[in-house]
A protein has these predicted regions:
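A general structural signal marking secondary-structure boundaries and capping sites
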Residues: 16, 83-84, 223
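Short, glycine/acidic-enriched loop or turn micro-motifs at the edges of active sites
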Residues: 14, 38, 55-57, 204
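Residue-level structural signal for beta-strand termini and adjacent loop
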Residues: 18, 202-207
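Radical SAM enzyme core and accessory elements
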Residues: 206-224
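Radical SAM enzyme [4Fe-4S]-AdoMet core and its adjacent flexible, acidic
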Residues: 47-187, 192-198, 206-211
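A sequence-level detector of short linear motifs
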Residues: 40, 200-201
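Conserved alpha-helical substructure of the radical SAM core
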Residues: 1-45
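Generic recognition of cysteine residues
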Residues: 31, 184, 202-203, 223
């Protein structure tokens, strides 16, 4: 039984025909991860869009390029305003928290709450030691998680989609050694590339034997 299918890129909205195919084959179960730089098309049987946001406008543009935040903002608002009263339910925000944007989490929530249904967060998972984007386990990371939990308890109870228990897990290594998953439930998700080859050890890994692997012991809990 397939609970959900998530289509990632590259950029899936460069191939709306492929997105439409997934929506038809897995009605109300297909999610699309997009940077929002292309117009968001209304697909009848799509579950929802995950729109990647990397901070407030300044931080997002620093990471993704000048003007990208405004372009994504316009495409999201256009979709919501042109597709009926409940169109906002089709849009979820995905924020990958890293060393450059961790101070903007509240601002991201405030910026996007009025136009989207939910936000889901994860932490950047490095592929090498010393990755400058990795926010190390410790005081600053704990503070981010605690802030999210507090926001979830108060005004954003129905907006932050991560359960409290999952947020707590993000404070520490919870199941990996080096690039090897140990307690991670990778069995729950089948990740394949565009050729149908299984990606290992998880969806952010690769099917290529000699490719770099994510550092499981510093996992950002992006999938689970």
């Amino acid at each position: 039984h397939v609970f959900a299918v998530t289509v990632v890129g590259g950029e899936p909205m460069m191939r709306p025909d492929v997105v439409e195919l997934f929506a038809k084959e897995f009605p109300k179960r297909s999610c699309i991860v997009t940077n929002g730089n292309y117009p968001l098309k209304k697909f009848k049987d799509l579950y929802f869009y995950w729109v990647s946001i990397d901070g407030d406008q300044k931080t997002h543009d620093t990471i993704r390029g000048d003007g990208t935040w405004a372009k994504t903002r316009k495409n999201v608002i256009d979709y919501v305003e042109n597709n009926g009263d409940k169109a906002y339910k089709d849009i979820w925000i995905s924020m990958t928290i890293n060393s450059r944007n961790y101070k903007t989490v509240r601002k991201v929530i405030e910026d996007w709450r009025d136009y989207t249904n939910k936000i889901g967060v994860q932490f950047h998972t490095p592929f090498m030691e010393g990755d400058p984007l990795w926010l190390p386990f410790g005081k600053e990371r704990d503070a981010v998680v605690d802030e999210l939990i507090d926001l979830q308890k108060t005004e954003y109870r129905d907006y932050i989609s991560n359960p409290k228990n999952q947020l707590e897990l993000m404070k520490k290594n919870w199941g990996g050694k080096g690039t090897t998953p140990i307690d991670c439930p990778t069995w729950a998700i089948v990740s394949v590339d565009h050729l149908g080859r299984e990606k290992r050890p998880c969806c952010i890994g690769s099917a290529e034997k000699d490719s770099m692997k994510p550092r499981c012991e510093e996992c950002g809990l992006g999938c689970y």
